[in-house]
């Protein structure tokens, strides 16, 4: 909408009505006058033609043209100002006489088919008006009915046509229009004068007031509106002047307050400067105190761990001696208290590192599912001891090969699940892992830990992530702890680029969840066992706990199995199944041997019975296997444990391997290099059955010398060897002219993601993980045999993963499997392990007494390799843990409990081996 000024609006409001009314009146006057003039002209013509018609009756009767001509000429001259011509027509519509022969008389004549007028008629054509009237004989009576043809009537003598000129009327009309326009312009001028005067009386004062208000806006508060004004303008003037006076008074008061506040602020700033100096000094003192405190906590925590590890270790050793029940109870109490104290010290040490910003996260490739499976397995013992069902559900779309810090991720899970176990008396603890976001290089995962514990009151939830604070002071008295676990967890999650939160309701449980960002490792090193052999098989699944059942059903849905689920064994449809998975409730405390009838019935219903056992029931695993149970799995069931057990069923169905393409030994010359005699003997025994020529070397130097002497079709190279490692030996061998194309296969026990790429980049052709399985070795030989081509496809038997009980001291079936089913070889491998144990024991004992012997990590590595072929999974895992800790920089004195446990396990292995070796 257009914004007009007040002057323009006033002019429009004044002139518009005046112009509109004047224009309407002028139009009305001109139109009325125009019609009036035409009517006057028509009346004048009628006053001429009607008497003339009466006067010409006699002349027409006598056909006297002269008399009629004189008569119309006189009338024409008398009225020449308006008359252009007068014409008389006879009864035959022929011109009888006219007063103006210069005009065309035909324009005044009636048409041939037009009847004679019976009375006066008027027609107009432009500036011409024609009047016609009949000449009637005196014998004619108007009362007579007219004949159908006026021309043939005896009383109609003709008619007179009078042509009038309208130009004179037009001139008069123009004069009237001019007069009206002049009068309207005069009125508009008068209105303009009055409007201008009104605008001057209104806009002038308003402009004065606007200027005054503008001066007030610019700060000239002494400005006032001057001059005489009328009515409302005077009221407005007084209002503006009053407002200016109020503003001036307010401004004066405000200025006074500002001056006073400025003075006070200046004094305050001076005081704040003094306080800032004092605060800066206090801050420096506090930072120095915090630094000293952090160093003190870190140093004291480290110093306390060393003697505490000795207390724990010697307590465990004492527990293995003959003790009275009271002494054993006291020692158990000492061990539990020492373990709790060690956990507290570890928390304080981690907290100190986080506070000091000295905790550095690793960025290494690792398998996510195996990492989570490992930590959940460790936590399952304490969960099952309390009768709590622990479940782990990793969604299938979560990537497994990631890069990050697996130990810190396990620490986060341990803290959260440990709290859930601590504050839950019955029910479930469920762990859910989902993918939240995925890109080409990163994945964000969400981990939820849900429990059915006591919950956290809303008033205490704000204190949950504060250091050395717990939701309730009585918690530390009932359950122990320092209040650092969640603080450390939060800081670790933040360091991983994530966040943590929770939701809790008293007496209904809590749900903690966190998000972390992990890099994706595009190189898949270890793949899960193939489940194609399960196609068409039926599996019966019995599990009373719905959450545990759902997790397992999610795993089974990724296989081609047909699954029949029942919450109870009695409700299971009676039929014969290929496999049966029977879940034992964690609250079940009776010996499983007492369930003989139930287990016997289950065995009769299936070809392969598997039991999902809580930790406290694992003591019956070996006895159950002897009674016909196919596999005993530890709860919670995860893909890393369940899928190999399922594919073990396929392995049992295969009595022998599928035949290879050549029934005889492969025409190959293979060299195996390993510094461990047990490993070298096993590899040699396996190769003797597969290839024609085998060369064995126990060092990298010997392998290089042997490679100089003869060509090889394939070389199996151990990586970690003294003096010269496998990578350096591979480089030297490939420098030989006749060995440049010889494939070298890396053989190592470190089956970690990223290891294969490192080895391939160093010149290795392929990768073979320890312990070496006969099937995998045979497949490798077929792939690299001369003439086959590395890219050629070889029909090989399906390789199934070995189902291993990680807590077994000696698994003879596993030892036989690792020795390719050769009993003598398995016994030799076990005996070589026993012969090697005294050397390891001496080194470990030297370390425990503080002598710090050299080569401990290499010796543990060698023992780790020997355990991989001797069927001792517990000692193998323990060696792997100690080796990883030592290689990651952990000091030997910090591993005292693990070393003592290793000594105990050596005794256990020797005791179990004596039963087999005799």
Curated annotation (Swiss-Prot):
Give the transmembrane region(s): 10-31, 177-196
Free-text disruption phenotype from the record: Inactivation of the gene leads to hydrogen peroxide hypersensitivity.
Annotated Response regulatory domain ranges read 669-785
List, for all copies, the residue spans of the domain called HAMP.
Answer: 200-252
PTM field: Autophosphorylated. Activation requires a sequential transfer of a phosphate group from a His in the primary transmitter domain, to an Asp in the receiver domain and to a His in the secondary transmitter domain.
Cystine pairings recorded for this chain: none
Its function, per the record, reads:
Member of the two-component regulatory system UvrY/BarA involved in the regulation of carbon metabolism via the CsrA/CsrB regulatory system. Phosphorylates UvrY, probably via a four-step phosphorelay.
- Would you tell me the protein name for this molecule? Signal transduction histidine-protein kinase BarA
Identify the species of origin: Escherichia coli (strain K12)
**What's the source species' lineage?**
Bacteria, Pseudomonadati, Pseudomonadota, Gammaproteobacteria, Enterobacterales
* Gene it is expressed from: barA
């Amino acid at each position: 909408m257009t914004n007009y000024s007040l002057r323009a609006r006033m002019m429009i409001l004044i002139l518009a009505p005046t112009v509109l009314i004047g224009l309407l009146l002028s139009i009305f006057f001109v139109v009325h006058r125009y019609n009036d003039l035409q009517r006057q002209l028509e009346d004048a013509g009628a006053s001429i033609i009607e008497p003339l018609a009466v006067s010409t009756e006699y002349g027409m009767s006598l056909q006297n043209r002269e008399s009629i001509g004189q008569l119309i000429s006189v009338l024409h001259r008398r009225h020449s100002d308006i008359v252009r011509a007068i014409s008389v027509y006879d009864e035959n519509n022929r011109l009888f006489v006219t007063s103006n022969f210069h005009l065309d008389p035909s324009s005044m004549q009636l048409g041939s088919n037009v009847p004679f007028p019976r009375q006066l008629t008027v027609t107009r054509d432009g500036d011409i008006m024609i009047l016609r009237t009949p000449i009637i004989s005196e014998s004619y009576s108007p009362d007579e009915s007219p004949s159908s043809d006026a021309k043939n009537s005896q009383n109609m003598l003709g008619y007179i046509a009078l042509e009038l000129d309208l130009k004179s009327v037009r001139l008069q009309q123009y004069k009237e229009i001019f007069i009206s326009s002049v009068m309207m312009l005069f009125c508009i001028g008068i209105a303009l004068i009055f409007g201008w005067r009104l605008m001057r009386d209104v806009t002038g004062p308003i402009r004065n007031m606007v200027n005054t208000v503008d001066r007030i806006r610019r700060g000239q508060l002494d400005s006032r509106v001057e001059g005489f004004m009328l009515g409302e303008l005077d009221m407005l003037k007084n209002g503006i002047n009053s407002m200016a006076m109020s503003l001036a008074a307010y401004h004066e008061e405000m200025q006074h307050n500002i001056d006073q506040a400025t003075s006070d602020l200046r004094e305050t700033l001076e005081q704040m400067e003094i306080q800032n100096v004092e605060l800066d000094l206090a801050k420096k003192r506090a930072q120095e105190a915090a630094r000293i405190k952090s160093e003190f906590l870190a140093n004291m925590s480290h110093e306390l761990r060393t003697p505490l590890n000795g207390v724990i270790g010697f307590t465990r050793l004492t527990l293995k001696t003959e003790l009275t029940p009271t002494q054993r109870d006291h020692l158990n109490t000492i061990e539990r208290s020492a373990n709790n104290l060690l956990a507290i010290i570890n928390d304080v040490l981690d907290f100190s590192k986080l506070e000091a910003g000295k905790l550095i996260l690793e960025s290494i490739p690792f398998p996510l599912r195996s990492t989570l499976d490992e930590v959940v397995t460790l936590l399952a013992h304490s969960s099952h001891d309390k009768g709590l069902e622990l479940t782990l559900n990793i969604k299938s779309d979560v990537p497994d090969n990631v890069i990050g810090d697996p130990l810190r991720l396990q620490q986060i899970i341990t803290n959260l699940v440990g709290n859930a176990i601590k504050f839950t008396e019955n029910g479930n603890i469920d762990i859910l892992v989902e993918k939240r976001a995925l890109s080409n290089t990163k994945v964000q995962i969400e981990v939820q830990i849900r429990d059915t514990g006591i919950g956290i009151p809303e008033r205490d939830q704000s204190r949950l992530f504060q250091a050395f604070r717990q939701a309730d002071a009585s918690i530390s008295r009932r359950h122990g702890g320092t209040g650092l676990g969640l603080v450390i967890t939060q800081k670790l999650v933040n360091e991983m680029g994530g966040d943590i939160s929770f939701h809790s309701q008293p007496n209904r449980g809590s749900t903690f969840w966190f998000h972390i960002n992990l890099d994706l490792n595009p190189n898949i090193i270890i793949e899960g066992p193939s489940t194609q052999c399960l196609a068409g098989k039926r599996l019966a699944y019995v599990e009373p706990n719905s959450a545990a059942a759902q997790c397992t059903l999610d795993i089974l849905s990724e296989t081609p199995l047909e699954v029949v689920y029942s919450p109870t064994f009695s409700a299971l449809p009676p039929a014969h199944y290929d496999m049966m998975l029977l879940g034992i409730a964690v609250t079940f405390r009776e010996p499983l041997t007492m369930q003989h009838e139930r287990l016997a019935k289950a065995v009769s219903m299936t070809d392969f019975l598997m039991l999902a056992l809580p930790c406290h029931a694992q003591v019956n695993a070996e006895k159950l296997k002897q009674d016909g149970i196919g596999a005993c799995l530890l709860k919670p069931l995860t893909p890393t444990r369940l899928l190999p057990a399922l594919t073990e069923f396929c392995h049992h169905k295969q009595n022998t391997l599928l035949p290879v393409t050549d029934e005889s030994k492969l025409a190959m010359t293979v060299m195996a290099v390993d510094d461990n005699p047990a490993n070298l003997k096993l590899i040699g025994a396996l190769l003797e059955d597969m290839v024609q020529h085998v060369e064995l070397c126990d060092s990298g130097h010997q392998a290089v010398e042997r490679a100089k002497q003869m060509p090889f079709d394939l070389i199996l190279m151990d990586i970690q060897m003294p003096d010269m490692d496998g990578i350096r030996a591979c480089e030297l061998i490939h420098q030989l002219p006749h060995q440049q194309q010889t494939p070298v296969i890396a053989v190592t026990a470190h089956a970690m993601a990223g290891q294969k790429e490192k080895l391939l980049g160093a010149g290795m052709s392929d990768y073979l993980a320890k312990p070496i399985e006969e099937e995998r070795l045979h497949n490798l030989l077929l792939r690299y045999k001369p003439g086959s081509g590395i890219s050629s496809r070889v029909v090989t038997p399906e390789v199934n993963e070995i189902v291993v009980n990680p807590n077994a001291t000696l698994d003879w079936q596993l030892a036989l499997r690792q020795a390719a089913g050769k009993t003598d070889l398995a016994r030799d491998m076990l005996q070589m392990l026993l012969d090697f144990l005294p050397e390891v024991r001496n080194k470990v004992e030297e370390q425990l007494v503080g002598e710090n012997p050299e080569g401990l990590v290499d010796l543990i590595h060698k023992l780790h390799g020997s355990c991989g072929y001797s069927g001792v999974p517990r000692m193998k895992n323990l060696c792997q843990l100690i080796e990883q800790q030592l290689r990651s920089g952990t000091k030997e004195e910090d591993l005292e409990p693990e070393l003592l446990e290793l000594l105990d396990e050596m005794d256990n292995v020797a005791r179990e081996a004596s039963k087999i070796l005799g």
